[in-house]
Amino acid sequence: MSTHQYQQLIEIFDNEFFADFNTRLIKGDDEPIYLPADDEAPYNRIVFAHGFYASAIHEISHWCIAGKERRKQVEFGYWYCPDGRDAQTQSEFEVVEIKPQALDWLFCQAAGYPFNVSCDNLDGDFEPDRVKFRRIVHGQVMEYLAQNSIPPRAARFINALQSFYNTPPLTADQFPWPEDPFA
């Protein structure tokens, strides 16, 4: 049995944020989605895909960045371009994924869980440059750490993860420069 179970994230998130933000982390059966409170549920829902731990981490990162008005909208008011993107659309997708994936990496490190950058384009007509994208995300991680600018909810979640998994404080040394495996 893995030491990282999605149920742990649900418990950590609920304990940390439900009372203050009326938001719950929910295991979904399909694609992830954020749903504000409505007639179906009196609380906001961060629905992650298929019980995947990494999906829960990633959806939490988007929630930690979204402002109060965005959190009142389905999917924070953003349009999502599905898998199968061309090079131009993929480039635009990666730009908006830098900060969320930097938080993913910080969350994973705080939980002692391996991080993998996601280009999320398995059915696209070209191969995204994962090393380049990981290096860009790495730069954002370094900026967050150097400038002590991790968004407040993200910092709170990091502290909760560190407490639950008994991991050390985050330092730049824990985030090595992504090497090119083909160089």
Regions found by a protein language model. Give the residues of each.
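Short pre-active-site segment immediately N-terminal to the catalytic Zn-binding motif
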Residues: 2-4, 39-55
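Short helix/loop segments within enzyme catalytic domains
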Residues: 107-121
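An active-site-proximal "capping" alpha-helix that borders the catalytic cofactor pocket
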Residues: 94-109
